Amino acid sequence: MAVIRIKKPRGPGEKDQPLEGEPKLKRIRIKTKVTDEDIKPKPKLKINLKKKKESADGKEKKNSLKLKLNLKKNEEPVKKIHKAPKLRLKPIRIPGEAYDSEASDIEDDPLIESGVILRILPDIQLEFVKNSLESGDYSGISIKWKNERHAVVTINDVMYGAILVDLPTVIEVNKSVDRKNLLKTFDVSQMLLCIRPIQEEEEVYALEAPDTEDLVVKHFEGIEDEIWENKETFLKGYNGAPLSDMEAKHLKEIALKGYDYKHGISPPLYNVRNRRFRRKMDPNEIDYVEKVVDMLLKQDKQAEEVSYDLVDKSELQARQERVSSWENFKEEPGEPLSRPALKKEEIHTIASAVGKQGAEEEGEEGMEEEEEEDLDLGAAFESEEEGSGAEGDKEQQQEEVGDEVDQDTGGEDDDDDDDGDIEAAGGESESDDEKDENRQHTELLADELNELETTLAHTKHKLSKATNPLLKSRFIDSIKKLEKEAELKRKQLQQTEDSVQKQHQHRSDAETANNVEEEEEEEEEEEEEDEVDEDEEDDEENDEDEDNVHEREHIQENKVVRELDEAPAEETLDQNDLDMMMLFGAEGDE
């Protein structure tokens, strides 16, 4: 450390004390401290400005300055300074960017965190938690850990007792920034399960999580007491710190609880710990099985004789026959059985073979019955087809005969009327087809509109429950699209209904016009028919008059003939006279 001292030179008669009336001068020292201790000490520089005393000769020497320079190195060894440990600070990460192994500013040890899931009760505080997630304000939510497994969750000044349980699966939590790539953030293997509201924090130790079990006690029920004692010992020495008063009070309850959750976080993983994951074999159990196998092998070696039989299918059938005959046989009293008794193993093998063969025979019989039923059905269908064919032939023959009769009875005269009827029927059928098409199109549009409205309501319901902003934006976009499609379908349906109404009105007008024309035609036809009837009546009257004239003439002729026959023979008339009389209608003399 360098020190500089500056002194003002005084005369020979001056004293060190200051004069009267003058202020006392302060001694000025300038010190410079070097904070960096790694710099080596530099040589000192000393300047003395005091005036020298007079020499013995009485001669006064000139004022001179004495300068001393110490350029020698400090011989003391420099002590080794211990450097402070370096703190490695991670760079500030831009929100939305995650770890990239191919980036230029790659991290040496990227951080992968572990997290827990908080599952709360579906009560009135659920909406408060959703609003906190949406707004990002978590001031009303706090978690206070009581020990490694118990915590007190406070939501909007309401305390809940919670227990940390182990999930049967490890869940990877991912996020997406561009809606295409997934980026892993952390793993989840535990869940903080809220049980019920509590009034005091001490109540959390008395809670038990539902659907939990202790896997160690479950698989080793014979040594439960020893397991519980070991757990209590572990809890007492947790982290080398003494237990709190509440933990010591509820030590046994904490140790006897189960913290292994049976289910996953989704419905398909219900009771997945027992349904899907089998327990692992303990090494002691493997040793026990090996010892038992060795014992059986030793007993097999120590046996005097070992025999085994290879059973063939034909032999099984023979044994089956013998078994069936043996069951049907009844032993008579006093007569010993000549057949030796079968062993249990043989009976078991024979019974299994009998069951298999019986099943095969039943299957064959079932196939035969099905084939017979198919044949019967085929024959029935053929008979029905033949009957229908015969009936069709008869109907066809009757129609042909009817056509011939129509031709013979003057069917040609009504050809024009038939053509008109056919044309009218064709027009009616075309109009009916158009009506059916319009009706089907209208029904199709109505069904599509109903489906869109149902989907729209379902999407709105999802939007009301969604908490993620990305999902909300997607639901909003889909709702806008569905509303546009529904509006378009409504317009199409309205246009279709209007067009159908116009067509119906046009058809009604056309039908009224056609009815008027038909009525006029019918009136004209009726007038023509009346004229024809009048002409026919006139002709009939003329014919009747002619017939009456002929009848009268014939009657007159008969009368004349009778009179001639009755007249006396003396007056004879020749043929010319008779003709003249007939011609002029003359009558004979009386």
Curated annotation (Swiss-Prot):
Phosphoserine sites (modified residues): 101, 104
GO MF assignments: protein heterodimerization activity
Comp. bias intervals (Basic and acidic residues): 11-25, 54-63, 549-565
InterPro entries, per database record: TAF7 (IPR037817), TAFII55_prot_cons_reg (IPR006751)
Principal place of residence: nucleus
Bias type Acidic residues, positions: 360-388, 398-422, 516-548, 566-577
Family named by the database record: Belongs to the TAF7 family.
Miscellaneous note of the record: Present with 1100 molecules/cell in log phase SD medium.
The keyword Amino-acid biosynthesis is annotated on this UniProt entry: no
Keywords for the protein's UniProt record, in alphabetical order: Coiled coil, Nucleus, Phosphoprotein, Transcription, Transcription regulation
Coiled coil (UniProt feature): 427-549
Residue ranges, annotated region (Disordered): 1-65, 325-453, 489-579
Descriptive protein name: Transcription initiation factor TFIID subunit 7
Function: Functions as a component of the DNA-binding general transcription factor complex TFIID. Binding of TFIID to a promoter (with or without TATA element) is the initial step in pre-initiation complex (PIC) formation. TFIID plays a key role in the regulation of gene expression by RNA polymerase II through different activities such as transcription activator interaction, core promoter recognition and selectivity, TFIIA and TFIIB interaction, chromatin modification (histone acetylation by TAF1), facilitation of DNA opening and initiation of transcription.
Listed GO biological process terms: positive regulation of transcription by RNA polymerase II; RNA polymerase II preinitiation complex assembly; transcription by RNA polymerase II
Pfam assignment, any one: TAFII55_N
Compartments where found: Nucleus
Biased composition (Basic residues): 1-10, 42-53
Modified residues (Phosphotyrosine): 99
